[in-house]
């Protein structure tokens, strides 16, 4: 008899919370739906996505530090209470404007390192991005005027012989290769090019 009574009590205990949970779960889901689509979340997502698209249109690359700063701003704004968020919308917009201005300033100062057509490859050759139809003018720094005129230079100009180098002095080709690692790679390639044609050069040298 005790087992039956215990079994009945257990069955009632187990069956009672289930309908309660079923009744509570849709109420919770309905209560959570407006929270997910609440106003403080959506504009932050728009600004972050708009920031990335804005910078990818011009240079096709995004600085990760500025993205982290925007995410921190987003967490600060959404972490506060909704009443505070509704009370101070202008302050949040000022913070966002300041963050965007700061990120763009950082990007302008470091734009020399983010040039998409100067990516050193492993094998020594430089991969160069062809200018797309959307790129009407290439961004350039004032001390590098040849990039504004020509954009990414084709390989035929870079592989020109020494005899034609006088006519290409105005392009400042020596400024394009500033890193010592790149010059070492180019010297290595030149040595191997002469060794491939080796028999002729070996006869001349000996």
From Swiss-Prot:
UniProt keyword terms in alphabetical order: Acetylation, Cell projection, Cilium, Cilium biogenesis/degradation, Cytoplasm, Inflammatory response, Phosphoprotein, Protein transport, Transport
One Pfam match, by short name?
UNC119_bdg
Its assembly, as annotated, is:
Interacts with UNC119 and UNC119B; interaction preferentially takes place when UNC119 and UNC119B are unliganded with myristoylated proteins.
Q: Which family does it belong to?
A: Belongs to the UNC119-binding protein family.
Protein name from the UniProt record = Macrophage immunometabolism regulator
Source taxon at top rank: Eukaryota
Q: Which residues carry this modification: N-acetylmethionine?
A: 1
One record GO biological process = negative regulation of fibroblast migration
Region annotation Disordered: where it falls in the sequence: 1-41
Q: Name the InterPro entries for this protein.
A: UNC119-bd
* Subcellular localization, as worded in the UniProt entry: Cytoplasm; Cell projection, Cilium
Tell me which residues bear Phosphoserine. Answer: 25, 140, 167
GO CC list: ciliary transition zone; cytoplasm
Keyword Acetylation belongs to the record:
yes
Write out the function statement from the record: Regulates the macrophage function, by enhancing the resolution of inflammation and wound repair functions mediated by M2 macrophages. The regulation of macrophage function is, due at least in part, to its ability to inhibit glycolysis. May also play a role in trafficking of proteins via its interaction with UNC119 and UNC119B cargo adapters: may help the release of UNC119 and UNC119B cargo or the recycling of UNC119 and UNC119B. May play a role in ciliary membrane localization via its interaction with UNC119B and protein transport into photoreceptor cells.
Q: What is its main location?
A: cytoplasm
